[in-house]
A protein has these predicted regions:
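Short alpha-helix in the alpha/beta-hydrolase fold that links the catalytic acid
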Residues: 82, 202, 226-235
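Conserved alpha/beta-hydrolase
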Residues: 83-105
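Short beta-strand/loop motif that positions the catalytic acidic residue
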Residues: 209-210, 215-218, 222
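An N-terminal hydrophobic leader/cap segment in hydrolases
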Residues: 12-45, 49-54
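Catalytic histidine-centered segment of alpha/beta-hydrolase-like enzymes
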Residues: 249-258
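Hydrolase active-site cap/lid region
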Residues: 148-204, 255
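Alpha/beta-hydrolase fold nucleophile elbow
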Residues: 128-140
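Alpha/beta-hydrolase active-site loop
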Residues: 108-128
Length: 272
């Protein structure tokens, strides 16, 4: 049994970087199911890999532009319940799949995904009118990665706000918390958490985002990422910043009218 446990730890240590990503390929929905006009986007990144995304066109007089980064077990299609309604409210919505997700090529890993997200932001920035900025929004892992990307982006002058939704504050901490809930992996939570790359730790970057406004949206009943992550991020952030507490499970955040209105109320506070 001891030998088996050691082999199990070695296996997870060699593959832990991929624990962050659970690629989803299938598309249950496309924007036309919600009567939204959209365009397919294909970006070729530095190493020749092609990344796929959608631009959902504002359904009424355009208010602004949002780029949305999904979590680790989703793709642009499965996250449509959290995004399509913003196009209905007047936002051009850009959504992209990470490597290995949806129609995107390549193999998912943290370094490449962080780099690809910056390229996606640059793609949008180059197409915005001079007077317009984009809002960067990320859910779960997408929000945590977006903290680092926005803090270090070469396109900060084109970013109006960062909005994180159910994001975590530390890669080591969330890894330990997730493993601690598994009877099989409970005993290995301490060594395995250090196998995850923490170079892009959100707590180290969120204080660098100012003067770009940051909104941290989190449910106090999130069953996967605890509310303490949001509080830690809020404490580490510098003004202007907002902590917005909602009532939701982890995934289906904006399926309710109340939570949609909460987000829309924040969006209305941003200067145009």
């Amino acid at each position: 049994m001891y030998r088996y446990n050691i082999l199990l730890v070695i296996f997870f240590l060699t593959s832990c970087s991929n624990l962050l990503f659970v690629p989803v390929k299938s598309y249950p929905l496309t924007p036309d199911a919600a009567d939204i006009l959209y365009e397919d986007i294909y970006l070729t990144v530095d190493d020749g890999v092609t990344i796929h995304g959608w631009k959902m066109l504002a359904d009424k007089n355009k208010i602004g532009t949002i780029v949305f980064f999904h979590g680790n077990g989703d793709n642009v299609s499965t996250q449509m319940p959290n995004t399509f309604w913003l196009a209905k409210e007047g936002y051009d919505m850009y959504v992209f799949d990470y490597r290995e997700y949806g129609q995107s090529q390549g193999k998912a890993n943290l370094d490449a995904t962080i780099s690809d997200m910056e390229l996606m932001i640059g793609y949008i920035a180059e197409r915005l009118p001079d007077e317009e900025k984009m809002i960067v929004m990320g859910h779960s892992l997408g929000g945590s990665m977006a903290v680092y990307v926005v803090a270090h982006s070469a396109f900060r002058d084109k970013i109006e706000s960062l909005i994180t939704v159910e994001a975590f504050s530390d890669y080591h901490e969330i890894t330990q918390e997730v493993l601690s809930k598994s009877w099989l992996m409970w005993a290995f939570q301490w060594p395995l958490k250090f196998a995850i790359d923490n170079s892009y730790r959100p707590l180290d970057s969120i204080g660098l985002i100012s003067p770009i406004p940051v909104a941290i949206i989190h449910s106090d009943v999130d069953e996967i990422i605890g509310m303490h992550h949001a509080r830690d991020l809020f404490e580490a952030a510098t003004e202007p910043k907002s902590l917005i507490v909602i009532d939701s499970n982890h995934s289906n955040v904006f399926v309710t009218k109340d939570n949609r209105q909460i987000l829309f109320d924040y969006l209305k506070t941003l200067k145009r």
